[in-house]
Amino acid sequence: MTPSLYNPLAIASKPFPAIYSEKILIFTIFSAFAEFERDMIVERTQEGKMLAKQNPDFREGRPKKFTKQQINHALTLLENHSYKQVEDMTGISVSTLVRAKKKKAAEAING
C-alpha cells in the first residue's frame, strides 16, 4: 500500500527522522515568508513616511486630542475644583491633567 496524501495514517507510518525533517523544512519555509512579509511592511511604511514628510503640515506621532486652549481652561478650573470634577466637566482624563500641570510647572521653572 502506497502512502496517500488523503490518508492521515500514511504520514504516521513514516519513520521519525523523515517527519522531523519535513517539520523543519515547513517551519523554515514559513519563517522565510514571514520575515519577507515583515520586511515588505517595514519598507512600505518607510516609503509612506518619506512621502508624508514632504508635506509641510506633517506631524509625526499621534495627534493631540485636546487643544492647548482646552488644556489651559482645564488647568484654570483645577484652581477651584478637584481633578475628578474637572475631568467630569471637561472630559479630559486625570492623567492628562496631571501631565499638563507638571509640564506647565516645568515650563514656569525653565521659563
From Swiss-Prot:
What positions does the domain Resolvase/invertase-type recombinase catalytic occupy? 1-56
Q: Quick check: keyword DNA damage in the entry?
A: no
The protein's matches in Pfam families, at most eight in alphabetical order, are given as: HTH_49 (PF18010), Resolvase (PF00239)
Lineage, top-rank taxon, reads Bacteria
- Gene Ontology molecular-function annotations: DNA binding; DNA strand exchange activity
* InterPro entries hit by this protein: Cry35Ab1_HTH (IPR040652), Homeodomain-like_sf (IPR009057), Resolv_N (IPR006119), Resolvase-like_N_sf (IPR036162)
- The DNA-binding region ranges are 83-102
**Entry's family note:** Belongs to the site-specific recombinase resolvase family.
Q: What is this protein called?
A: Resolvase homolog YefC
Originating species: Bacillus subtilis (strain 168)
